[in-house]
Amino acid sequence: MKPYLDPRTNLRIALPTILLGGRKLDYGVYGGIGRHTKFPTMDMLFPDPIYGDITQMNYWPVEEKLRRVNLLVYRIDPTNTSLQPASNLKWEVGADADWNGCSFSIDWFREDMTSGFRYAYEYLSVIAKKYDTSAIDKSALAGPPSLEGLPYQNDTTLTAYSFTTNGSRTLKQGLEFSFSTRRIKAINTRITANGAWLRTEYMNSQPEYYRPNVMISGKPYPYIGIYEMNDGNFYDSLVTNLMLDTQIPSLGLIFSTSFQCKWFSGRRSMPESKYPDSYLDKAGTVHPFDAAVAEGDAVLRHLIRDYTESLYQYQRTPFAMNVNLKVSKRLYRDKVSCSLYVNKIFDVTPDYWRGDALVRRSVTPYFGMELDFKI
């Protein structure tokens, strides 16, 4: 049994205090790094056996007593003991400061999981007999025909089953910040701002098997393409939140107003491989793929996938802002608190163009109440 450790460490260095504007400025830098391991479930490691069948003969005359169907039943053991735990490494560095009741912090982080779980396909060659029922003399039958002496040909079929692999990668990185002021006496209000820029990438670290959905001479396509680059996406966004917290103690009122801004959000699909690096035949043999040869081959050219450049362009959604309001009232010596909130009471969501299409956006506000008791 192999042990898996999840070490983590954090360190903060407080720098010497300095005077700024006649007041103390306390500041420091910090960092941390750690690993997190996620173990596969039992059904990933030991899934149930997979059974399949292939029709070898289907003799189906009008006379019911003469009918016979012969199947080859095969069993696949999908035991997956080679699957490893998914490992995630995260580190961060940052700085913080406090001055005159105001605080500020900024943090950069990166999180990389290179062995995440995903489903993949494995192809197996199954050899079955294809009996020639045209050789059966129905007039000589007293019952279902015998397979002995019946001519047949061996036919190889590629069959697939899914299993879990360590073929997924997730990379997250971003910048977070927060800032808050002391309560401004003139209006008894504290200002708090925070936000983050986040970029997430999803990638497949293992080759993809692809079989064109076409028929060749009335039979399923005989080859499986093996592609290196496939199904990846990345997303990024920048969001901020500005909150004004105003208290009126004499009336027992608290006003909270937040301005939530999404400055942009975007996504892009990673380009897929147009040409496979190799391909698999029905016998399970891997052959190198020559694009020049495949262009003129009526069968191999189906492995060349269509590539549309517009599908992989970066798509960005522009600025949008929502304003939320919450009013709280304390009653009966602070034993009862009643709050009314209205989210998206005001919004800024301008229309924008995406290519030749105009995208119109709308926001639906909603409201509610909260009632808290203290006994």
Locations of regions flagged by a protein language model:
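Extracytoplasmic loops and strand-loop junctions of Gram-negative outer membrane beta-barrel proteins
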Residues: 1, 60, 72-79, 156-164, ...
